[in-house]
């Protein structure tokens, strides 16, 4: 991704957060955080990664709501960011946060088991 695409992506991320948080009134759309926006080099397409607070059903409902509002969101982006052509938007759930949380949970579990093993060894020595 080139420098211009990166800059456009960062600006879109900021604007999308504002649009989704303030302009959209769809009840299906829950608490959404825009985690990343990746714009293609030709600025024709933008993949928007989102994180949704809630269960799998809430995530799917939020995605459906965002898909329905895609045209409105794109027109808002077009008004806020001066580009020859506003990129086509694709929404995806960002799994990296959940993946990171799972790894952290496993590390804690291993650490706890390791601490438990050390205490057992100390008790045996006494």
Swiss-Prot record:
Name of one Pfam family that matches: RBFA
Does the UniProt entry include the keyword Thylakoid?
A: no
Q: Drop me one GO molecular function for this one.
A: ribosomal small subunit binding
Naming one, the record's GO cellular component terms include: cytosol
Compartments where located: Cytoplasm
Stored SUPFAM superfamilies: Ribosome-binding factor A, RbfA (SSF89919)
Q: Mind listing the UniProt keywords for this protein, alphabetically?
A: Cytoplasm, Ribosome biogenesis
Q: Name one GO biological process term.
A: maturation of SSU-rRNA
The primary site where this protein sits is cytoplasm
Alphabetical list of InterPro entries matching this protein: KH_dom-like_a/b, RbfA, RbfA_dom_sf, Ribosome-bd_factorA_CS
Q: Which PROSITE patterns match?
A: RBFA
Q: What does this protein do?
A: One of several proteins that assist in the late maturation steps of the functional core of the 30S ribosomal subunit. Associates with free 30S ribosomal subunits (but not with 30S subunits that are part of 70S ribosomes or polysomes). Required for efficient processing of 16S rRNA. May interact with the 5'-terminal helix region of 16S rRNA.
Name the PANTHER family on file. RIBOSOME-BINDING FACTOR A, CHLOROPLASTIC-RELATED
Q: What NCBIfam families is this protein classified in?
A: rbfA (TIGR00082)
This protein's assembly is summarised as: Monomer. Binds 30S ribosomal subunits, but not 50S ribosomal subunits or 70S ribosomes.
The family assignment reads:
Belongs to the RbfA family.
Protein name, as recorded: Ribosome-binding factor A
| Source species of the chain | Geobacillus sp. (strain WCH70)
Task: Name the gene for this chain.
Answer: rbfA
């Amino acid at each position: 991704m080139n420098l211009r695409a990166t800059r456009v992506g960062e600006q879109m991320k900021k604007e999308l957060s504002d649009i989704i948080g303030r302009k959209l009134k769809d009840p299906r759309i829950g608490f959404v955080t825009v985690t990343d926006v990746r714009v293609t080099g030709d600025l024709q397409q933008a993949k928007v990664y989102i994180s949704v607070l809630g269960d799998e059903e809430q995530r799917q409902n939020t995605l459906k709501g965002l898909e329905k509002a895609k045209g409105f969101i794109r027109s808002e982006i077009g008004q806020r960011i001066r580009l020859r052509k506003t990129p086509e938007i694709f929404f995806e759930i960002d799994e990296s946060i959940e993946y990171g949380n799972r790894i952290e949970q496993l590390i804690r579990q291993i650490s706890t088991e390791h601490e438990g093993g050390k205490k057992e060894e100390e008790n045996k020595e006494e």
